[in-house]
Amino acid sequence: MNNNLVAEGDVEKYQRDGAVVLRSVLDDQALGELAIAVEQNMQSPGPWANEYAANSKQGRFFDDYVNWSRFDAYKKHALTGALAQIALELMQTTSGRFFHEHVLVKEAGNNQVTPWHNDDPYYGVNSNNSVSLWVPLDPIPEKIALRTIKLRRDFDKNFIPRRFVDQTAYVNDARGYEQFPEPQLLDESTDIESFAAMPGDIVAFHFRTLHSAPATTDYEGRRRVISFRYVDTDAVWATRPWKTSPPLEPNSLRPGDLLTDERFPLISR
């Protein structure tokens, strides 16, 4: 591994705050290959693709996930090279598993805000050690940048997730889960960080880290991002009191089983 990709201070910040930005860690070749794959993905969506602005005059908002087996660039960069090694370094482990990739493309003029949420309750896996690598393919200025809230005790809880479209809770009550905090409370947090980024940079955040992103209503450019998501080898299959996202089938996995099937490839260093 190129030790310059992740400095000791970056690891410390990630472990402390649940988020960190790494500057200029992907080269032009990697970015070009991923950009081509995103265009191919948009032309040939997977079964779980969404169009959040499909029936309006506003800019397109496309998202899709778990297509790494269809597009070689996703697979290549998820499993080998810089991304996998960065994930392992931030998780402070020598081996882990790739969970999935997630493509998010907001065209200019889209009014869909990505509301505050953390990813953990949406997923059908449990892992205390995890990381999402948020990879921008376009310049991300401050006005449309990803925002996170430092992972502190007040917000490091099991929350009932909310729907992005109308912010309603998935369920009214669930054992072991709390209602999600009011957005205004989160907006007023003194622990918010905003990560303006350029192609080649990566924003890394834990599955339990609260994060959000503004609309692109007043922005003239595209915002293409791929998130690559990883877990430690002790991650286990889990059920939730709601439909998980991605809606993966258990196949032979039972709650508490390690993620040892081929859908979750092993990475190591």
Task: Indicate where each model-derived feature is located.
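Non-heme Fe(II)-dependent double-stranded beta-helix
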Residues: 1-16, 22-116, 122-124, 257-258
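Conserved hydrophobic/aromatic beta-strand scaffold that supports enzyme active sites
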Residues: 19-21, 132-136, 192-194, 202-204, ...
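Non-heme Fe(II)/2-oxoglutarate
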Residues: 48-49, 53-56, 159-164, 202-204, ...
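Short, charged/polar surface micro-motifs in flexible loops or helix N-caps
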Residues: 83, 108-111, 139-142, 154, ...
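Short, structured patches in soluble enzyme cores that scaffold and shape functional sites
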Residues: 102, 118, 135-139, 150
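Glycine-rich phosphate/pyrophosphate-binding beta-alpha loops
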Residues: 119-121, 130, 212-216
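Short, conserved beta-strand element in jelly-roll/cupin
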Residues: 124-142, 229-232
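Double-stranded beta-helix
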Residues: 141-210
